[in-house]
Amino acid sequence: MNAPARRTPLYSCHLAAQARLVDFAGWEMPVNYGSQIEEHHAVRRHAGMFDVSHMLALDLTGPDATAWLRRLLANDVAKLRTAGKALYACMLNPTGGVIDDLIVYRLSDNQYRIVVNAGTADKDVQWMRRQIGEMPANVTLTPRRDLAMIAVQGPHAREASWKAFPELRAGSESLPPFSGAQLGDYFVGRTGYTGEDGFEIAVPADKAEAAWAQLLAAGVQPCGLGARDTLRLEAGMNLYGQDMDESTSPLDTGLGWTIDLKDEQRDFVGKTALLAAPATRQVLGLVLEDKGVLRAHMAVFTPDGEGETTSGTFSPTLQRAIAFARLPPGVAAGDTVEVDVRGKRLKARCVKLPFVRNGKALV
Amino acid sequence: MSTIPNDLKYTKSHEWIRLEADGTLTVGVTDHAQAALGDVVFLELPEAGRVVSAGEACAVIESVKAASDIYAPVAGEVIARNDSVTDAPESVNADAYAAWLFKLKPANAGDTSALLDAAGYATEIAD
């Protein structure tokens, strides 16, 4: 028997907005509220909002918090020199596979906020608790299911957020990209998953519906997981479980830039395995030149050997099919390759990621 | 609620079929199917002259989410395809019953009697 689907504090808002609901990692989540493509364009051109309460925020406190995170994560939290700064990082297993990708905010000297994926949240917490015991570290890890999270994204996302919550303006106006701040009841992070500017706002669960209604009144379009997927693909951002998982090295999935080896003294889980196994693949974007749609796990034929797509979709911004492909090292941006699309070999052009940034096509 | 016009026939695989006065069939996908697929972005339709058997996958409809086959409702020969819908795939979402996909000349006129009527299709998608 499957467990009953979990619902976020915004469930009734989704029903009111006539969402089409689907199961996502055990959560009943909106895939769209009508047209996925219109929601996609709303984020590229104006402002959209996503219920991301199914993701889990965790608070980490204690004198060993920094030392422990420097061992837990392949990226180095020592880079977070000022309070509020955020870091994207992979949490690896001892064989160098990706347990999860996450964002960590430094709140103060011994206090961090970590945001992990929904589908991996339970596994992540178990793993983290085990690592606390193994070090052992004087830290406290607190899952924050009492928070709801709304990601407001788009060129007008910040203005719309201030219209909805005027009290946040003073504290968040000068917030640099990839940083966050606690402002009264709200934790505001200037981060996102769409390639646009915006805020990810965490609020106490009992204030979530009011926050959603205020954003709606400020003209922000509700957007579902469908648009979230096309937007993140255009933005060149990996999706856990699709573009990487516990069996893949971050080096083979385009995440080598998140592995920080600068401090040779620093040991982190998975480091030995990564150093012993250099990258065998590179990740490039594909833009389909022929007509059709690219999907995950299509074979890619190149003069240097075969590769495979890991994610693919129709790009509403480019009006063409796009994909991420894991390819042999010899292939370069600008090369033409062939993709097996439902039994036909179609031509695709290799490009550097991302495809789109800040509303502009880059390919 | 999906629209299911009474004057059309249907298949369990979500094609609608209009029986034309000259004995030919016009085929499309139902409103229920387009709603489930989401935004349609690409169609691959069979060429005129192609001979198909009943239930044969003869066209592809792709939404942002996924690709789906479209099946021949009966055996016959494709006599026309709607190129204007391949140029504007979103017209399937706008009006699934106006956006026909191809026309078919049945091999045996009697084959159409096995197709579902509107009530039968409504029962089929009720679950």
UniProtKB/Swiss-Prot annotation, chain B:
Belongs to the GcvH family. It comes from Azoarcus sp. (strain BH72). The keyword Hydrolase does not apply. One of its GO terms (cellular component) is glycine cleavage complex. Keywords: Lipoyl. HAMAP family: GcvH. Its cofactor is (R)-lipoate. This is Glycine cleavage system H protein.
